[in-house]
C-alpha cells in the first residue's frame, strides 16, 4: 500500500512537472508572438493576418513559413501555441527552434477549385483566380516587408510547408514570390497552379499518396515543373491516401536541411553575401536517377532504364529518405 502511494505520488509529481513545462513553453511562445494584418482588396477575403514567432535568440538565421489549415487568426494562434484541438505543429516548430529560424504563419483561404488543376480550367476561370490570388500574394509580401523592417526578419531564403488545402495555397504563393523562397514542401495538395520558369529558382518537395484523389494532378505538376528544369523531389507513397506520416515529414525536413546547407555553401562562395544555390547545376550533377512511378533508384548512367515520364534526378543526400518505404 505504501509502495502504491509512493508510485502515485511520483506519477502525480511528474504529471504536474510536465504540465508546468508545457505551460511555460506556451507562455514563452505567446510572449514572442507578433501579429500583423494586411488588407487584400478582395471582398471575400478582406484581410490576411500573419503571425511572426522570432526564435528565442532574438535574431533569426532563416525563416520557416507555415501555411496552415485555419479558418481565422484565433485558430492560427492556437495552432502555434499548441492549444488547438485540430492540428499540431510541434515537429515543425521544433525544427525551426533547433535551427534558429523565425516562424511566419497564416491561415490558408481558398480562392480556387480544389478539385482541378490549371489545365482543367477555362481561360476565364484561370484569369479570375490568378487576379484574386495575385492580390493575396501582394498582401502577403507587404506583411513580410513589415516584419523585415520592424522586426529584423531576413528578406529571403525562406522555407515553406503546407498540407492539403494549405499546400495548395503555399504552391500558388511560391510561384508568385519565388524570390522569397529557398525550398517549399507541399503535401497532398491535389490542386496546382501552372509551373513557371521563375519557379525554378527554388527547391520543390512535392509529396502525395498513391491512393490520394489528386494523385494524377500531382504527377502532372511534377512533369510540367521538371520539364521547366525546376529542381523537384517528388514522392508518391504507396498505400497512402489523403493523410501524412512520419516518412513524409522526414523527407520534407531532409529537403529543407539540404537546401539550407546548399544555401550556406553558395553564400560562403559569394563572400558572405546571401546567394541562392545553382540548383540547375546541382541537379544535373546528381549521381542518381529515380523512377517515381516504380519507386526505384538507379545510377545516372542507367537513366535509360527509367521511362522519360517517370524520370527524376536525385541528389545523393536525399536518396535514403526518398527510398524509405
Residue positions per predicted region:
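Short beta-strand element of the alpha/beta-hydrolase
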Residues: 59-71, 78
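Cap/lid segment of the alpha/beta-hydrolase catalytic domain
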Residues: 80, 103-135
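Alpha/beta-hydrolase active-site loop
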Residues: 122-152, 172
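Primarily recognizes the serine-hydrolase "nucleophile elbow" in alpha/beta-hydrolase
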Residues: 147-201
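The feature captures the conserved acid-bearing segment of alpha/beta-hydrolase catalytic domains
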Residues: 179-256
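Alpha/beta-hydrolase-fold serine-hydrolase catalytic core, especially in secreted/extracellular enzymes
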Residues: 228-229, 238-325
